[in-house]
Protein backbone atom coordinates (compact mmCIF):
# COMPACT_ATOMS: atom_id res chain seq x y z
CA UNK A 1 0.00 0.00 0.00
CA UNK A 2 1.45 3.34 -1.04
CA UNK A 3 0.18 6.15 1.15
CA UNK A 4 1.01 9.70 0.23
CA UNK A 5 1.77 11.98 3.13
CA UNK A 6 1.05 15.65 2.82
CA UNK A 7 3.83 17.24 4.87
CA UNK A 8 3.79 20.97 5.45
CA UNK A 9 6.90 23.06 5.90
CA UNK A 10 5.08 25.39 8.28
CA UNK A 11 6.27 25.27 11.89
CA UNK A 12 4.11 23.52 14.42
CA UNK A 13 2.55 26.19 16.64
CA UNK A 14 3.76 26.24 20.23
CA UNK A 15 1.18 25.46 22.89
CA UNK A 16 -0.13 28.50 24.75
CA UNK A 17 1.68 29.32 27.99
CA UNK A 18 0.23 27.69 31.10
CA UNK A 19 -0.38 29.81 34.19
CA UNK A 20 -0.85 28.20 37.60
CA UNK A 21 -3.28 30.54 39.40
CA UNK A 22 -3.03 30.12 43.19
CA UNK A 23 -5.85 31.90 45.03
CA UNK A 24 -7.93 30.77 48.00
CA UNK A 25 -10.94 32.97 47.17
CA UNK A 26 -12.78 30.86 44.61
CA UNK A 27 -14.66 33.73 42.99
CA UNK A 28 -11.47 35.73 42.49
CA UNK A 29 -9.65 32.63 41.18
CA UNK A 30 -12.49 31.82 38.77
CA UNK A 31 -12.58 35.35 37.34
CA UNK A 32 -8.79 35.49 36.91
CA UNK A 33 -8.72 32.06 35.27
CA UNK A 34 -11.55 32.94 32.87
CA UNK A 35 -9.88 36.19 31.86
CA UNK A 36 -6.54 34.48 31.25
CA UNK A 37 -8.16 31.71 29.20
CA UNK A 38 -9.93 34.35 27.10
CA UNK A 39 -6.53 36.01 26.64
CA UNK A 40 -4.95 32.88 25.16
CA UNK A 41 -3.38 31.29 28.23
CA UNK A 42 -3.93 27.75 29.48
CA UNK A 43 -4.76 27.84 33.18
CA UNK A 44 -4.35 25.39 36.04
CA UNK A 45 -6.00 26.40 39.31
CA UNK A 46 -4.99 25.76 42.92
CA UNK A 47 -6.87 26.86 46.04
CA UNK A 48 -3.72 27.37 48.14
CA UNK A 49 0.06 26.99 48.02
CA UNK A 50 0.00 23.41 49.32
CA UNK A 51 -2.27 22.43 46.43
CA UNK A 52 0.04 24.28 44.01
CA UNK A 53 3.01 22.22 45.23
CA UNK A 54 1.00 19.03 44.63
CA UNK A 55 0.11 20.19 41.09
CA UNK A 56 3.76 20.85 40.31
CA UNK A 57 4.92 17.61 41.93
CA UNK A 58 2.44 15.72 39.72
CA UNK A 59 4.38 16.92 36.68
CA UNK A 60 1.69 19.13 35.17
CA UNK A 61 3.30 21.56 32.70
CA UNK A 62 3.31 25.09 34.11
CA UNK A 63 5.18 28.02 32.57
CA UNK A 64 4.53 30.65 35.25
CA UNK A 65 2.81 30.90 38.64
CA UNK A 66 0.50 33.74 39.72
CA UNK A 67 -0.17 33.54 43.45
CA UNK A 68 -1.90 35.46 46.17
CA UNK A 69 0.27 36.09 49.23
CA UNK A 70 -2.19 35.57 52.08
CA UNK A 71 -3.69 32.08 52.01
CA UNK A 72 -4.50 29.34 54.49
CA UNK A 73 -2.33 26.23 54.66
CA UNK A 74 1.21 25.38 55.64
CA UNK A 75 2.61 27.74 52.95
CA UNK A 76 1.56 31.24 51.99
CA UNK A 77 2.55 32.92 48.72
CA UNK A 78 6.01 33.79 50.03
CA UNK A 79 6.54 30.21 51.17
CA UNK A 80 5.50 29.03 47.71
CA UNK A 81 7.96 31.47 46.11
CA UNK A 82 10.75 30.14 48.32
CA UNK A 83 9.79 26.54 47.50
CA UNK A 84 9.87 27.38 43.77
CA UNK A 85 13.31 29.01 44.03
CA UNK A 86 14.59 25.86 45.71
CA UNK A 87 12.74 23.13 43.78
CA UNK A 88 11.94 24.77 40.40
CA UNK A 89 14.49 27.58 40.01
CA UNK A 90 13.58 28.33 36.39
CA UNK A 91 9.85 28.72 37.03
CA UNK A 92 8.74 32.34 37.30
CA UNK A 93 6.27 33.53 39.93
CA UNK A 94 4.33 36.76 40.28
CA UNK A 95 2.76 37.44 43.67
CA UNK A 96 -0.28 39.59 44.39
CA UNK A 97 -1.36 41.24 47.62
CA UNK A 98 -3.63 43.95 48.90
CA UNK A 99 -0.91 45.04 51.34
CA UNK A 100 1.48 46.15 48.61
CA UNK A 101 4.32 47.82 50.53
CA UNK A 102 4.59 45.14 53.20
CA UNK A 103 4.37 42.48 50.52
CA UNK A 104 7.11 44.16 48.47
CA UNK A 105 9.38 44.37 51.51
CA UNK A 106 8.82 40.70 52.41
CA UNK A 107 9.25 39.66 48.79
CA UNK A 108 12.60 41.43 48.59
CA UNK A 109 13.73 39.66 51.75
CA UNK A 110 12.59 36.12 51.00
CA UNK A 111 11.93 35.38 47.37
CA UNK A 112 12.64 38.33 45.06
CA UNK A 113 9.33 37.73 43.32
CA UNK A 114 7.57 40.63 41.63
CA UNK A 115 4.41 41.88 43.36
CA UNK A 116 1.25 42.99 41.59
CA UNK A 117 -0.69 45.17 44.04
CA UNK A 118 -4.43 44.61 44.45
CA UNK A 119 -6.61 45.84 42.98
CA UNK A 120 -5.10 45.32 39.53
CA UNK A 121 -6.70 45.28 36.12
CA UNK A 122 -6.63 42.16 34.00
CA UNK A 123 -4.70 43.82 31.17
CA UNK A 124 -1.86 44.67 33.58
CA UNK A 125 -1.79 41.08 34.81
CA UNK A 126 -1.62 39.72 31.24
CA UNK A 127 1.17 42.18 30.35
CA UNK A 128 3.22 41.20 33.40
CA UNK A 129 2.76 37.49 32.72
CA UNK A 130 3.82 37.88 29.08
CA UNK A 131 6.81 40.04 30.07
CA UNK A 132 8.04 37.45 32.60
CA UNK A 133 7.48 34.63 30.10
CA UNK A 134 9.36 36.45 27.32
CA UNK A 135 12.24 37.09 29.75
CA UNK A 136 12.69 33.32 30.02
CA UNK A 137 12.51 32.69 26.26
CA UNK A 138 14.83 35.51 25.16
CA UNK A 139 18.31 34.45 23.99
Model-found features: residue ranges?
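Charged docking surfaces used in two-component/phosphorelay signaling
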Residues: 30-38
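Acidic catalytic/metal-coordinating carboxylates
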Residues: 48, 75-80
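Negatively charged, flexible loop motifs adjacent to catalytic sites
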Residues: 99-103
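Short acidic/polar segment at the start of the alpha1 helix of CheY-like receiver
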Residues: 25-29, 72
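Active-site residues of response regulator receiver
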Residues: 68-69
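Acidic, metal-coordinating helix/loop segments flanking the phosphotransfer/catalytic sites
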Residues: 45-64, 104-105
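Non-catalytic signal-transmission and effector/linker regions of two-component phosphorelay proteins
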Residues: 1-20, 26, 33, 51, ...
Amino acid sequence: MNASLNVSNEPVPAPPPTVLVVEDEILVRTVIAAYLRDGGFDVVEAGNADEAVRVLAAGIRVDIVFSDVNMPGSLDGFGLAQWLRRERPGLEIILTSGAAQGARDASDLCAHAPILAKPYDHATLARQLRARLSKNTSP
